[in-house]
Amino acid sequence: MSAPPWQTSEYDETEGFTSNQEGPSAAPSKTVASDWHEVKTEDSRVYYYNSVTRKSVWEKPEELMNDFEKKLSKLAWKEYATADGKKYWYNVNTRESVWDIPDEYKAALVDEPEQQKKALSSKIKSNDNKPAVQSIQRHGPDVAAPSSQPAKDQSQQISQGSHKRTINFVQQKDKRQKRSNDYQHENYDTYEAAERAFFKFLDSHNVNPSWTWEQTVRELCDAKGYYVMKDPWHRKCAFDAYILNYLTDQSDAEKNRVTKIRKEFIEMLKSSDKIHSYTLWRTVKNEFSSHPAFNATSSETEQQQLFFEYKQKLLEDEKQLEKDRRKEALDDFCSLLRNMNFEPYTRWSVAQAKFDQDPRYTRNSNMKYLSKLDALVAFEDHVKHLEREYILDKQKQKKEKHRIERKNRDAFRALLQDLRVQKKITLRTKWKELYPIIKDDPRYLNLLGQSGSTPLDLFWDTIVDLENMYREKRNLVLDCLEVLQISVDDTSNIPEIIARLSEKLKDREESEAVTEDLIEEVVNRLRDKAIHKKAEEKRADERRIRRKIDNLRSAIKYLKPPISADASYDEIRPLISILPEFAALHSEEHRMAAFDKYIRRLREKRELEKQYQNRRGYYDVGKDESYLANSARPHSGYEDGRLEYSADLASKSNRNEINTMQDVQENSISHVTATQPAVKNIVDDAESSEEGEIR
């Protein structure tokens, strides 16, 4: 049985690595080993590690690629596989993904040399019994050369990330047959055992991460135990794994040390009552300079870092405590606001006065942590909430009020409709006629005082509805009147006309919509229209007669010589008969009325002049001796603070009263004698002024 590769003695430390590819045309040749090695992660993902630069990449370096792989790497299409193993191709230039193999990629696969395929196949067979990558995965990065595993087709052999990788160890010059036969040894039967022995050898010589591999070879190549692994490549991998484990152990030890020191340092700070969030470093340094936990740290920088971490923790705790206290105080304050009966428009000054008098506020110890700004903001939010509730309540009340008012209006409309059916409301009905009927009805009383339409408005709406109905159907009645050749005037027999129209309308299809009330209304309106027209004509005739009378009176007024107030109609008739105004009046009564009106105005004017002269005579000083005597007396009837009236003043007053009564009697007598019974209706009922106005 041959010895394992790591126990081979016939190999120099400076030799390179040889390719293990075998094939019909592949002769064994020695090449310079690459610094890149293929490694697998714990989840079997393959990456590449450079042992010199200690750089790791996911893509296969060009140094490890063969000619065919280099050719594929230059293509824009790259082969990948999904999580379930399904292949797809991605174009790095156009960023396009397809499930079917592109033609460009397929052509490259077809051009793959046949000899290379055979070489890959023989390479896979020679590596079947080599140790798995996982055997050294615990110690450090796995280093391996590129290889392929058998596949069902060409594309599977070169799929990126989808085919397994196996370690391609360096073969010796004697060309061992299979690695499985080399694992047997008298001392180390497995690679792991030999590796552990090499780790102990390195540890016994105090090898640390500051050593390089070249330094290790120079220092320990002659030491016993160095060749426990005969293959230089395996020793190099074991050295890298040892350094990685050394660094890991050193890091874990440092973490444990720092954790222990931090715990003891913080307990030391907590044990003192002098340490607060505002404590300075010099205070801590002076206080704990002799404490074991303080001196257990490696440097003053580490001490300061631990102190500042503890100080920051105290600050955060204080801020959180203050935040919790403010929140608790704010919650208590909001609860107090809800329990106090504030109006929606309460001012902050009024609220403050209530807070100062409320023991729930003054005795609450949490309120000292509540700032005035927070309290003001909370109060504003509470007032806004009250305002919203107040507005919503008002809107609700307004809607309810509108609903009740609408129901009241609907009920009153129903009342009017009932009265309309009972024929108590017609087109000729007046509000003063309807009011006694509805004044005690609750449907009417409920409508009083509310907004919107009043009872009178709704009554007029009903009348308007009746009027619209009347206008729609009156043409049918008018057509029947025209057919029957009936003319309605003030002397017409209304019941007879209504009966004839009703009988006539029964023969027409539209008669169902025409009621007897509608027929009566049409006939009555026609009669009222005729009466009104006749009255207008009569008033027009009277106005024309009055204008003619006034014209004649005006003509008499300007006669030369003027007519005296004592003249009679018979005396002046020959004088005025030649006037055109006299001829315009065809009635003698109207002519006499014009003359009488002129005489009456003339006498009224004379009476007014007499009254004016009497008033002037009363104040005439030259004709009244008693007035002169009284005016000669000093103070004229006012002595010793009291007023004395003269007896002559009373006699003057009686005299004027007697004269006034006599004038009134004369005017009445003259008026009676001048008035003629024939024109009494025209003169007394409609007396006109000079401008023709009735007064």
Swiss-Prot record:
Q: Where is the signal peptide?
A: none
User: What are the protein's UniProt keywords?
Assistant: mRNA processing, mRNA splicing, Nucleus, Phosphoprotein, Repeat, Ribonucleoprotein
Give GO terms for biological process: mRNA 5'-splice site recognition; mRNA splicing, via spliceosome
Where do Polar residues bias regions lie? Answer: 146-161
What Pfam families does the entry give?
A: FF, WW
* UniProt key word ATP-binding: no
GO function term, MF aspect, one: RNA polymerase II CTD heptapeptide repeat kinase activity
Q: Where is this region: Disordered?
A: 1-35, 120-165
Protein name, entry field = Pre-mRNA-processing protein prp40
